[in-house]
Amino acid sequence: MTEPNHSTLDPGRLARQGFPEIVYCQSKTAAQVADNLRALAAANGSAFGTRLPADRAPEVLALLPDAVYDTDSRTILLGRPLRTGDNLIAVVSAGTSDLPVAAEATATLGFLGHRVRHFNDIGVAGIHRLHERIEEIRSAAVVIVVAGMEGALPSVVGGLVSAPVIAVPTSVGYGAAFEGLAALLGMLNSCASGLVVVNIDNGFGAALAAPRMLSQSLKTMP
């Protein structure tokens, strides 16, 4: 691997942790993003980046014509997804406004090679929508729940499923939502036992946590 002169990459992360280094694109130039993706793809066979702004994507794609950019998730893929697991991971989002964060989680899981199913717009304002899908959600090995506003949905789901639940607060909401802080605090104070919470808008973090939970549970199986 020829390493870019602006970054010190970690090509051994795939062997060490089970997933490769993923490029955070938001604060990088198009050339830096392209260089890093190209180098990681040379080392691992493929590469993936998150938070690539839509207005910068054409510049990156001009440098990497074989790459694929997804507008909803703001992710970019160079090469083919990995093949790592067959367990189903569910991504449940409260509202359509939460879609960018849920899409980031879904796209990241897809790159990592996991089976993933997204259940969109089934928040607590119309709780019957969740009840209509709950049996499908219960078939998942891990459930990622994405919600803004008051952040109630993860607590509700956490009381209805036996799988681990990862809560993702989003910055969606009006004034006193404080750009996701209200949802974050609500999730951290959930009465649903065992709920775990990642940072505001961090669909990527949830997508990395879910497979690590699965890998540990598989190690402990007889």
For each feature predicted by the language model, list its residue ranges:
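Glycine-rich oxoanion-binding loops at beta->alpha junctions
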Residues: 77, 115-136, 181-182, 198
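Glycine-rich phosphate-binding loop
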Residues: 132-170
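Short glycine/serine/threonine-rich phosphate/pyrophosphate-binding segments
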Residues: 33, 98-103, 127, 147-157, ...
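Glycine-rich phosphate/diphosphate-binding loop of Rossmann-like nucleotide-binding domains
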Residues: 86-126
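C-terminal binding/interaction regions
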Residues: 93, 135-138, 172, 176-222
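Short glycine-rich or small-residue beta-strand-to-loop segments that form or flank ligand, phosphate
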Residues: 23, 47, 88-94, 143-145, ...
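Long amphipathic alpha-helical segments
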Residues: 1-67
